[in-house]
Amino acid sequence: MVTMRADEISNIIRERIEQYNREVKVVNTGTVLQVGDGIARIHGLDEVMAGELVEFEEGTIGIALNLESNNVGVVLMGDGLMIQEGSSVKATGRIAQIPVSEAYLGRVINALAKPIDGRGEISAYESRLIESPAPGIISRRSVYEPLQTGLIAIDSMIPIGRGQRELIIGDRQTGKTAVATDTILNQKGQNVICVYVAIGQKASSVAQVVTTFQERGAMEYTIVVAEMADSPATLQYLAPYTGAALAEYFMYRERHTSIIYDDPSKQAQAYRQMSLLLRRPPGREAYPGDVFYLHSRLLERAAKLSSRLGEGSMTALPIVETQSGDVSAYIPTNVISITDGQIFLSADLFNAGIRPAINVGISVSRVGSAAQIKAMKQVAGKSKLELAQFAELEAFAQFASDLDKATQNQLARGQRLRELLKQSQSAPLTVEEQIVTIYTGANGYLDSLEIGQVKKFLVQLRTYLKTNKPQFQEIISSTRTFTEQAEALLKEIIQEQIELFLLQEQT
């Protein structure tokens, strides 16, 4: 029989007492009262904060949005099919945040920053809050550098600057996403990080955009955040903030970023769905009262940072779909009032074969020529006014039978100016090529050509300049001004090429 000595027993007990670590952990818990339609009502959670993450027994995460006297309204970040009435819920003490790093470049992720492209996990050692405050007035400086889109109509007449917020607005199927994707393609070699946020889009549309980026080598500097049409409303609501957090990570590291939200009206619809299910009082078009704040707090995060903060920038291009050209609806007017201008795409122009279908008359950039290089200002200064006058004259000319020579010439010039603004999709032009194109049209060199010949001639002219006269491009890129030397060189080349082109066309 084994004998136990009393001193051994007391030593063991003493050791155990010394090892005992008295740790009191207070967990704020509650009970599920009701669950369904992506919403759960919880009893308890007395000390939960607005916007705090809560965790359900089976692992689903939710956000506490409604704090009422006898229950808490939680929106679920998942389907929540396994949540049962009476199961427990605990508050985490955290608010929504995502991991951030350079490794996200070239990846397709969801609103929780989890990869959905099947290429494995993304390593990240830092995290950022999904909702973080926008830079204040002292942290900003005015926009002064151009963000070239590669589209003549925009860069010459509705210029976008780094740190600006420019709305792209129009009916469905008018080429809004094409304008945005062309802008991303044009950032190749410009040291600009791009984020494309797809909210409530068809999976096929997002796949098409990603394929375009991969084929054109744009994925290496682009992050795609996608929440499809079948995603829970909570994730569609969070996706733009996730994209903004990723863009901010680079902006505060003294980098230039551009973010496209496609489109915030789908985010507003998801938020409306959540709000109505939470029984918040509906307002205009059944949207909740704070739908303006939903978009303003997102778009205000776009900024050009001050020199003290490293002069990084975040340019926002939200895309809003209108119904039969009605820009006075609730969400379009909200976003118009928040942004620094809008690019209006017209279904009539699109159907008339003018693509990109930008209505130059009612499109505006509130930053203006501050977002253009000097050379572009010199060449394109009057073209917006000329096109507006031409559109007015064209409408008037439909009723007039006999027009004087000056009016006929003005109409002919306007038609050629409109023709040179046409551009194929995914074919952005460099700023030097745009200057050549606009100068040729604005100075009447295209007047001797038929309208059908304009595009062919301009392609030929740009190709000739690129291969045979690289010095023109060098002058513009080094001085950023349209010097007398550059003008003389260009005049000579245009005259020579027009004569050659007309001879070729005759034979």
Swiss-Prot record:
Reaction equations catalysed: ATP + H2O + 4 H(+)(in) = ADP + phosphate + 5 H(+)(out)
Membrane topology: Peripheral membrane protein
Coiled coil, from the record: none
Keyword Nucleotide-binding part of the UniProt annotation: yes
Broad class of enzyme this protein falls into: translocase
Pfam family, one: ATP-synt_ab
Task of the protein: Produces ATP from ADP in the presence of a proton gradient across the membrane. The alpha chain is a regulatory subunit.
Keywords: ATP synthesis, ATP-binding, CF(1), Chloroplast, Hydrogen ion transport, Ion transport, Membrane, Nucleotide-binding, Plastid, Thylakoid, Translocase, Transport
Family statement drawn from the similarity comment of this UniProt entry: Belongs to the ATPase alpha/beta chains family.
E.C. code: 7.1.2.2
Protein name per its UniProtKB record: ATP synthase subunit alpha, chloroplastic
Domain of life of the source: Eukaryota
Gene coding for it: atpA
Binding site for ATP: 170-177
Lineage, top ranks: Eukaryota, Viridiplantae, Streptophyta, Embryophyta, Tracheophyta
A single GO cellular-component term on record: chloroplast thylakoid membrane
GO molecular function list: ADP binding; ATP binding; proton-transporting ATP synthase activity, rotational mechanism
